[in-house]
């Protein structure tokens, strides 16, 4: 029995059913200050397609979201509405008794699947809803999502995953074998997280639209607050990139780590040449050097620029693409996204694939709500899957956290484990009232 042996608790859960839902198109005008600007996306308005699951319990709700950068957010909202109907009338216990059935219910509808499958707008919507159910389940238990997962046995963890299309790389039995050694020492690792936090890197200083003066000022401020890993956006103009990377390296010092992010703008030969020009600044990795779908292109780039690593994954649709990237050697840093993948279930699958191929997971964040999501993923990876955060850092950007009820807590450049129940993405009433998008306006 997945939910445990406490019969009375199971009865309580069985009494809680999903009775309805409400959706919101939330958009923040980040393009005004060029926050989030890069070579591919020069003027993003960070946005959330947000869903609230209502239940038969007056005080129990589930909150989920997926992230976009403005126009098109309404498409995700429409897809959420189409899929959410599949949850109405379902009990929380029925959905979570075998969590893989939740994933398949929302990704395998016999007609909606046609506009995927397991990719694009429909998968972003599925992620918002799957995450909302996990949020709801965790709130019922009065625990954060990371704690709910970290209390699972290896068998329960593996039972969350849809292994269809993965068994040539990872079987359920192999997953359990990977997890079993990590079931020892979990309490000590959790204590370490409460003491030290989980290491992060920041993109807050490196947006492409920032002036050199702004870059210096923000880098100095972040360095003083404890950050040692800095990412800078590149790819628009080589001479501009050379100057900006020089400015960042001067400001951050020789002992800090630099990462560069091209946001998919280069062809493969262009990427190789451009990265070689930037190599003197010693980037630890280059992110999204070409099309996010070009697995063999990433493989060619990785071979040409070694020992600089290739990082990708924020637009990797699903576990199957990640499997192929890892099998091919096309990535050396896995940047999974908690609402690009199909929610918690598929995030857990990709974590185990990465462990199987000995590839560090450094989740993508930065957009509204993403930092709040990924802190849970990184904690789970450390406590349950790998037992280390050596060579692992989770992305962080210092904006829009005031719009969620339980924002991330950073200390000395590290994520501190969230204590509030749920998945940390409940928006404030002020955010819903002040930033809900209406096309008439």
Model regions: which residues?
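Metal- or metallocofactor-binding catalytic centers and their adjacent structured scaffolds
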Residues: 54-167
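Active-site mouth loops of central-metabolism enzymes
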Residues: 197-215, 234-235, 263-267, 311
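Catalytic domains of carbohydrate-active enzymes, especially glycoside hydrolases
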Residues: 218-230
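Catalytic core of soluble alpha/beta enzymes
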Residues: 231-372
């Amino acid at each position: 029995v997945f939910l445990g042996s406490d019969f009375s608790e199971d009865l309580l859960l069985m009494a809680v059913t999903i009775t309805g839902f409400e959706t919101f198109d939330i958009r923040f005008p980040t393009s005004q200050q060029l926050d989030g600007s890069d070579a591919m996306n020069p003027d993003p308005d960070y946005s959330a397609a947000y869903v609230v699951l209502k239940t038969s319990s007056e005080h129990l709700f589930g909150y989920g979201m997926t992230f976009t950068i403005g126009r098109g957010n309404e498409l995700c909202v429409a897809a959420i509405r189409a899929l959410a109907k599949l949850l109405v009338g379902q009990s929380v216990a029925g959905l979570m008794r075998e969590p893989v059935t939740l994933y398949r219910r929302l990704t395998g509808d016999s007609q909606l699947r046609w506009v995927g499958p397991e990719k694009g707008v429909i998968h972003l919507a599925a992620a918002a809803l799957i995450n909302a159910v996990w949020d709801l389940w965790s709130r019922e238990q009065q625990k954060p999502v990371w704690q709910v997962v970290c209390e699972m046995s290896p068998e329960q963890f593996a039972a969350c995953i849809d292994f269809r299309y993965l068994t040539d790389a990872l079987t359920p039995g192999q997953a359990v074998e990977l997890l079993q050694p990590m079931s020892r020492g979990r309490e000590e690792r959790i204590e370490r997280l409460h003491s030290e936090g989980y290491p992060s890197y920041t993109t807050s200083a490196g947006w492409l639209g920032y002036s050199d003066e702004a870059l210096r000022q923000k880098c100095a401020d972040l360095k003083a607050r404890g950050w040692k890993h800095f990412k800078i956006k590149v790819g628009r103009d080589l001479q501009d990139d050379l100057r900006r990377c020089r400015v960042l390296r001067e400001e951050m010092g020789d002992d800090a780590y630099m990462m560069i992010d091209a946001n998919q703008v280069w062809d493969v030969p262009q990427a190789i040449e451009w990265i070689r020009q930037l190599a003197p600044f010693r980037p630890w990795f280059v992110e999204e050097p070409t099309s996010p779908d070009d697995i063999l292109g990433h493989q060619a780039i990785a071979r040409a620029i070694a020992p600089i690593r290739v990082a990708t994954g924020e637009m990797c649709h699903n576990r199957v693409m990640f499997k192929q990237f890892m099998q091919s050697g096309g990535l050396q840093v896995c940047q999974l996204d908690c609402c690009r993948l199909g929610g918690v279930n598929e995030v857990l699958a990709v974590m185990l694939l990465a462990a199987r191929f000995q590839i560090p997971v450094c989740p993508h964040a930065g957009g509204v709500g993403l930092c709040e999501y990924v802190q849970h993923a990184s904690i789970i990876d450390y406590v349950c899957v790998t037992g280390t955060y050596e060579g692992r850092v989770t992305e962080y950007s210092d904006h829009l956290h005031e719009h969620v009820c339980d924002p991330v807590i950073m200390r000395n450049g590290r994520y501190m484990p969230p204590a509030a129940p749920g998945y940390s993405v409940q928006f404030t009433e002020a955010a819903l009232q002040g930033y809900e998008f209406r096309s008439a306006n």
